[in-house]
Amino acid sequence: MSLQKSNKITPFLTFDRQKWAELRKSVPLKLTEQDLKPLLGFNEDLSLDEVSTIYLPLARLINYYIEENLKRQTVLHRFLDVASPKVPYIISIAGSVSVGKSTSARILQALLSQWPSERKVDLITTDGFLYPLTTLQEKDLLKRKGFPESYDIHRLIQFVSDIKSGKRHIQAPIYSHLTYDIIPDQYNVVDQPDIVILEGLNVLQSGMNYPSSPHNVFVSDFVDFSIYVDADEDLLKEWYIARFLKFRRSAFSDPNAYFHHYSKLSEQEAIRTASSIWDEINGLNLKQNILPSRERANLILIKGEDHAIQTVKLRK
């Protein structure tokens, strides 16, 4: 039995790293070190061992879910006596700023596009559905960026609804971390892929997070499998500050960068600034809006100090 024993009532099965790795079975590792490098986040050093131990078992599990989903679609369309449109399988990945959601999303995209057969897997981030910078400034929301009210949630819900309706050539806005803004007139086009991975802070949130923007459906209503990437807040803050310091020496040095002025800070000033941003914005958003959505996920990946995933929780 590959489960950790607990007397606590929980909707999750809990696996340690070793037991989860055993569930890989015979799934082949097709990624090389060269393939892995461009998938990693700015402040992450993830190994092929992590891919084999954590992400290959996860890819195997998701493939089982996809197979069952296709069977259910076939049954429904047979019952309705209608032709079967191509409806992508949607995976969502949520979690805090600096936890490594984007890296997890890119690794899953690479694995699921190669095994068990070649498939088209699109990756979309919800950053593109933030309001443009001018709108955030007009609404006095710059210090609330990433909070529920900073998103055009109706547009995001329409986007995922169109995907699940089998529509073609659906446009997703593109966000630039350099300019801190939506790129005008540029889009990612989703055209009936096999899988869509939707990554962002808000993909598990519900109507309680949007009291001033009521609607009857949420992003999670259209998601087939949801993942939450978790870590202790102390680690998240530490990783955020480390990433900020690296950006200060690289991306922020670009004169076109929105945060170019941070490149002129001393190291101690940069640490204080990053710590303050975490406490006043990212940490607050984590406590109020992101962390409360964790228990809605189908799978929780819990990271330790070295960014390696130590525990996996799978909804029963």
Curated annotation (Swiss-Prot):
Pathway connected to this protein: Cofactor biosynthesis; coenzyme A biosynthesis; CoA from (R)-pantothenate: step 1/5
Annotated compartments: Cytoplasm
One example GO MF annotation: pantothenate kinase activity
GO-annotated cellular components: cytoplasm
Binding site for ATP: G95, S96, V97, S98, V99, G100, K101, S102
Reactions that this protein is recorded to catalyse: (R)-pantothenate + ATP = (R)-4'-phosphopantothenate + ADP + H(+)
Domain of life: Bacteria
EC id: 2.7.1.33
Gene3D superfamilies per record: P-loop containing nucleotide triphosphate hydrolases
InterPro entries: P-loop_NTPase, PanK, PRK/URK
Pfam families the UniProt entry points to: PRK
GO terms (BP aspect): coenzyme A biosynthetic process
Catalytic class of the enzyme: transferase
Primary location class: cytoplasm
Keywords per UniProt: ATP-binding, Coenzyme A biosynthesis, Cytoplasm, Kinase, Nucleotide-binding, Transferase
CDD domains: PanK
Entry keyword Kinase: yes
Record PANTHER family: URIDINE KINASE
Entries under NCBIfam families matching the protein: panK_bact
Similarity remark: Belongs to the prokaryotic pantothenate kinase family.
Name of the protein this chain belongs to: Pantothenate kinase
Organism, scientific name: Actinobacillus pleuropneumoniae serotype 7 (strain AP76)
Gene name as annotated: coaA
